[in-house]
C-alpha cells in the first residue's frame, strides 16, 4: 500500500454545544437543566443567572449573550443525554459587579439562588427566583449613584389625558400625577430621567425591555426614545386592580387620603408600578413611602431645552457634572442632601412662603457661623440613611449596612442638641428623634461586632452575650480550633518534624502538611491526600473524624448567627418610615447648610421675592463662571425687567447687542440661573435682587442639527421658538439668543423682528433678546416696553478690548471680523472681509425698509 492509497480523514471536532432551548429535547436534559429551562420559560426576556455551588451560571442562549456582553469565556457543560450545552458563569461573591454591567447595558437579570444547604439536600438542590433586577429596581449600593435618584416610572395614556407615577425603591420615594398636556408628560420624564419606564400594552412580547433608542409599534409615539421601556400587561394597570393594589399596600379603605381618588390615570399608573415592584423583589417587601400626589403646574416648569441651555445638571459641551450649576451649588455633606439639591433644582417653587422659609434657614445659618460649621461637621458623619433603610426593609442589607445605619442614627441626638435653640422649622425638624430609633441604634451596636464581615453566612457577625445558644456554639467551635492547634504541637513532637503544619481548605478539609524533604519521617498512620511541588499533604482517620464534628459545629454556628442577624434586620425594617422621615429632614437641612456655606464664601445676597413681574438684579454674577475664574475677575452686571403698576418704567423686553465673544450668552444664562436659584430658596450671586415669581423659564440658546428626526439647525431653532411663543405667559422669563441666524439675512431679520414684536405686544413675558441684528434696536423707539442694552468694548487703533459690561444703548457693530482675526484667520482673508463689508454697508437696503414698517 502506498501513501496515495490512504484516504484523508476529517479531524475530530467535538459537537457544538446547544445554545437554543427551542432545539433541545427537554426530556433528555438532566434534572438541573430541566429546572433551569422551566424557570427560563417564565422569564423569556430576561437573562437568568442560576446558582450552582460557588458560581452563578447561565446556559443556552443566555450564556452566549452574557459571555459576549461581559467578555467572558463561553464554555460548555454536560447537560444529560442531549450532550453539552453552552455555559458561562461568574463567582457568586462577585455577582453584583457583573450584574451591574448587564443592567447598565439595558438587560433585566433574574437571580435563581439556592434556598437550601446543598449538604442537606435530598436529590436536586432547591432553587428559587430571589431577585429580578431591572434598571429601575436596583437596591445594591454598588449599582447606584449616590448623588442621584434611580427612578422607576409608569405611564398610562388615553386619548386626551395621561397618568404618571414614579418611585425610587432605594429611597422609598413614591409620587403620582395626572394631566392633559402630552408635552408636559415628555418634560416630566426628561426632568426625572427614569432608568426604566413601564408601559401597559396588549403587545404579544410582554416583558420586553426596550433599551434606549429601540422602538416598538406598541410604544406610544409621544414617549421620548431616550429611555428604557418595559412593556407590561394591562391588567395590573386596570382601574379596579390598581386601586385594589394601593388600598391593600397602604392599608386604607379609600384613596382620598392619598390625594388621588379623583385622578383615575394617576391611580392606574401608581398601582401598576407598585405591582411591578412587588413582583421583582422576591426576597422581601420594599418599603415605599406613603404615596403622594402632586400637580406639575405647582412648580416652576423648566423644560429639557432650558435645563440643557442653562447647564443645570451637566454641561452642554461634554455632558459632565463639573461646570454645571449643580456642581457650583453642591456643598452638601451627605448623599441624601446631594440628591435633594438635584431635585430642588429641577423642580423650583412658585410659593413665596415656601421660598421664604428656605431663605430664613439659610439666613440663620449665615448669621450663626458656629452652628453652621458644627452642623456640617456632624452631617459628614451620617451615611445614606435612605438607602441603608431601603436595603434593610427589602432584606438585602448586610451587617456593615446595619452598623453604618446605627452609627448614623447615633448622630441624630447630637444633631438635635445642636439645633436646640434654632428658629427655622427646617432645623427644628432635626430635634424630633423618636426614642425608639436611639434604642434601635444601641441594639444594633450591642448585637453586631464593630467591623463585621461582608458576607452574612460565614460567621463573625454577632458579639458575645447576645444569645446564650450562640455563645455555646461559639465555645464549641473555639474548643475545636484549640484541638487543631494542640494536634499540630503534638504531631510535631511525635514525628520530630518542626515545620509540620495542620491546614484547611474548602476542597480537602483539614490536612497535615509536611515538606517533601521530610517525607521519610512520615508516620505509618498518615494517608497521603495530595502531592504539591514542595510539600505532601496527609490525613489521619482521627483528623477526618474530628473534621466532621468541627464543620458541623461551624455550620450550625453560622446558621444561628444568620438567624439572629435577620431578626435584627427585620426590626430595622419595621422602623423604615420613622427613619426615612428623619432622613428627609437631614437632607433638607444639609442642602440649606451647604447653600449657606456657599452664600458666605461667594458673597451671595438674599433676594427679595415678590408677587409682581419685576426682575431687578444689581451687580449680578454668573454662579458657575465666577467659580471658574480667579477671585474678582468676573465683571458683574445689572438687570432691570418687568413692567407693572409699580415698575412701569422697567422694560418687558431687552434687545441686547454687542460683539461676538463679548459675553451676551453668558449674561442671558446668568439672569436665568439667578432666577432659578432664587426660586429654590437659595441666596444669589448679586449685590441685591428683587425678583417676581416666574411660572416658567424658556431659553433658545444655540442650536445643532437633529439628525435623528432629519431636522436642520434652522428647523430646530424654529421649533424651539414656536414652543416658546405658544406656551410663554406674562409671568414667564424668556431668554433668546440669535433668533433667525440659521437662514438668509433678510429672512432671519424679519423673523427675529416679528418674534420680538409679538413677545413685547402680545405675551409681555420678561424677555432678553440677544442679537446681531442691530436693526432690532429700532423696536425701542416704536414700543414703550422695549429697551436697548449693549455689551461694551473699548476700541484701540489695532484691536478691541472686551469690557463685558452691559449698559443702556444699542451697539451698531458686531466686530465679527475682529473676532476672526483673534481666532487666527489669514490676513488676506481679514482684509478682503473688510472690503466686502464696506460695500455691503454702502448699498444695504435694510434700514430703508425698516423705516416703512407700520
UniProtKB/Swiss-Prot annotation:
InterPro entries tied to this protein: DNA_mismatch_repair_MutS, DNA_mismatch_repair_MutS-lik_N, DNA_mismatch_repair_MutS/MSH, DNA_mismatch_repair_MutS_C, DNA_mismatch_repair_MutS_clamp, DNA_mismatch_repair_MutS_core, DNA_mismatch_repair_MutS_N, DNA_mismatch_repair_MutS_sf
From the UniProt entry, list the residue stretches annotated as the region Disordered: 1-21
One GO term of the biological process aspect: mismatch repair
- Report a single Gene Ontology molecular function: ATP binding
- Does the keyword section mention DNA damage? yes
Task: Give the matching SMART domains.
Answer: MUTSac, MUTSd
A cellular component term, taken from the record's GO annotations: cytosol
Residues engaged in binding ATP: 658-665
Q: List the disulfide bonds.
A: none
* Residue runs in coiled coils: none
Record's keyword terms, sorted: ATP-binding, DNA damage, DNA repair, DNA-binding, Nucleotide-binding
Concerning its family, UniProt says: Belongs to the DNA mismatch repair MutS family.
Q: What does this protein do?
A: This protein is involved in the repair of mismatches in DNA. It is possible that it carries out the mismatch recognition step. This protein has a weak ATPase activity.
**Protein name per the record:** DNA mismatch repair protein MutS
- The species is Trichormus variabilis (strain ATCC 29413 / PCC 7937) (Anabaena variabilis)
- Gene designation per UniProt: mutS
